């Protein structure tokens, strides 16, 4: 039985001979859906429209949006990450537009996570003005912060981090020359709490804490304890902690688990290594590499930094490996998965900002990057839309029936709720496989087996529960 027959008989199936796209079903349940879409550099109007058009109906749980605070001027993407005030007035939209976006997403059952900067302000030395006209210099933000609210004289030239394995430097020196806030200060903490609570008042459901590793975990906790919903299901926290899982690293990822989820960058590195050269059969025990517990892990095949650091699979990776990596990530039971939705030019030009100033629109099924004016629209790809429904359906079921007859061919089930096959080799794969699915579903025999043919560099995902 080939995959075309399978597709006609199940709720969701994915064929990935290339980056083929299908429109997702509009059905999803009231149970919280788990997948986060990082809408990188999309403006607020575009995200609100996309929540209505596709993100909500497709069953995504969250959108992660860029930092909404006023920042330094400029078109490059990284200007968003140099705040100059806590006015909701970034290049992606103003306060009214932000609130409109949140309301539109909420109306379709989608929660909103804001990328949030507690560690630092800008690196701009001389007098300047931000995106909303606020005057500032590197260590003076009138009405907000002054010189004594920052770390100084940390013991390195120019006060910049040199040794990224030294706890004191990591948490007291400047990251890339960015003015480093003294987050131990009661005054600084109060300003950060005001900002977080303002975002909450506008409907924000969670925060991605940028550069969390550069803030002592107890100081970050002191801030978050003053935010309504902290340590409840009403507020999702994920923290950017590079590394911290290997022997000898002074700042440990586990220090931050009490505050929320933690990024697992090692996960992305392992996915790339397996799909490019190491063999995907090695991924069976990906959840037991000594990183952090699945319940606290926020994982991704690539995020916006990974696109620019050459340590992750991207849309430019060869032989459909990026798409297949996404299929695996959404099928495998480790962590909460984030999926990047970005733009094509940023993969090669690491500074360039978004097309059309962030005004994004995915045409039809999102397949044609040219028609989308340079936006990749990954959240509309079959691998993401179809496998998001798969993940929503299988939820907490266990990985079972792992089969890997060759290093680049794997199949496994998620309990009796879902089954996935990935062929990362160039040649077709004809096999009789154990599905774990109930007999009589998708032509599964009485022994629970199914015979399939799957093209090279392709995958199939099946679930038997409506979402």
Where are these regions (language model features)?
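Classical eukaryotic N-terminal signal peptides for Sec-dependent ER targeting/secretion
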Residues: 1-9
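Glycine-rich FAD cofactor-binding loop and adjacent beta-loop-alpha segment at the N-terminus
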Residues: 83-89
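Active-site-proximal helices and loops of the catalytic beta/alpha 8
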Residues: 9-16, 21-36, 40, 49-56, ...
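Solvent-exposed, flexible loop/coil residues
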Residues: 90, 185, 441
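Active-site mouth loops of central-metabolism enzymes
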Residues: 35-46, 178-190
